Design a protein with these regions (language model features):
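Asp-based, Mg2+/Mn2+-dependent phosphohydrolase catalytic module
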Residues: 1-8, 38, 94-98, 119, ...
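N-terminal helical cap/lid subdomain that shapes the substrate entry/recognition surface
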Residues: 3-116, 143
Length: 231
């Protein structure tokens, strides 16, 4: 099989979100608030356990009143915000407005960093004439993240779940991405970190390759095998 197009997931594949501690510190600083260090660390850990940071850990428990929003969170911007701010509100903060501020922070370029080998791999694909798309379950526009970090020139199409009302693993989302790139599924490789969501591309006929969802420092070259796979 000749690969003519590669689709990448966003979070945990090309980019990694900041830590919960960094996330909380940034929002408190922006609000001009402080917490004693032990309390800040406890609060950050509680937010992590709650799954309040999109792109971070999954929630240890989803409250019953949020189960519907959580299951369909990536289908609309409104549900995405409702799900994650709802999880955040399980953790007491000094000001209730901080819950929305935390959500807003996670949509900023400063909250994200590309994996160390992301640019190298994307450049390698471009030099081989291979089309690149991003397919993400998400509730907001991630294009500014790619522009700010210099990766946008490598991407031929962005297919975001909330813009189509379809979530991975629905094959229609991957089909939309293939159509946007002008490639057929049988000549397309999907790269992601979620075996259920990203694995949905296999039903369409795409090859699938998984990477580990790890902190960037712990995964310096996890994307490089993609270049070997496309030849």
């Amino acid at each position: 099989m000749t690969i003519k197009g590669v689709l990448f997931d966003f979070s945990g594949t090309l980019f990694r979100i900041e830590s919960s501690e960094s996330w909380l510190r940034a929002v408190l600083d922006e609000a001009g608030m402080t917490l004693p260090e032990p309390e800040l660390l406890r609060t950050a850990a509680a937010l992590e356990d709650a799954g309040a940071l999109a792109g971070g850990s999954y929630p240890q428990h989803v409250p019953e009143h949020l189960t519907g929003a959580w299951a369909t969170r990536d289908s609309t911007a409104e549900l995405h915000r409702a799900a994650y701010t709802g999880l955040s509100r399980q953790v007491p903060l000094p000001d209730p407005a901080l819950h929305d501020a935390l959500y807003d922070r996670h949509m900023t370029p400063a909250a994200w960093a590309p994996y160390p080998d992301a640019a190298e791999v994307l450049e390698g694909l471009r030099s081989r004439g291979i089309a690149v798309g991003v397919v993400s379950n998400i509730g907001w526009d991630l294009r500014p993240i790619f522009r700010e970090h210099g990766l946008d020139p490598y991407v031929g199409a962005y297919v975001l779940s909330y813009e189509h009302g379809i979530q991975k693993p629905d094959p229609r989302l991957f089909a939309t991405a293939c159509d946007a790139l002008g490639v057929i599924p049988q000549e397309t490789l999907m790269v992601g970190d979620d075996r259920r969501a990203d694995g949905g591309a296999a039903a369409l006929g795409c090859a699938v390759h998984f990477v580990e969802h790890l902190p960037a420092a712990d995964r310096p070259d996890g994307l490089r095998p993609v270049l070997d796979m496309v030849g």
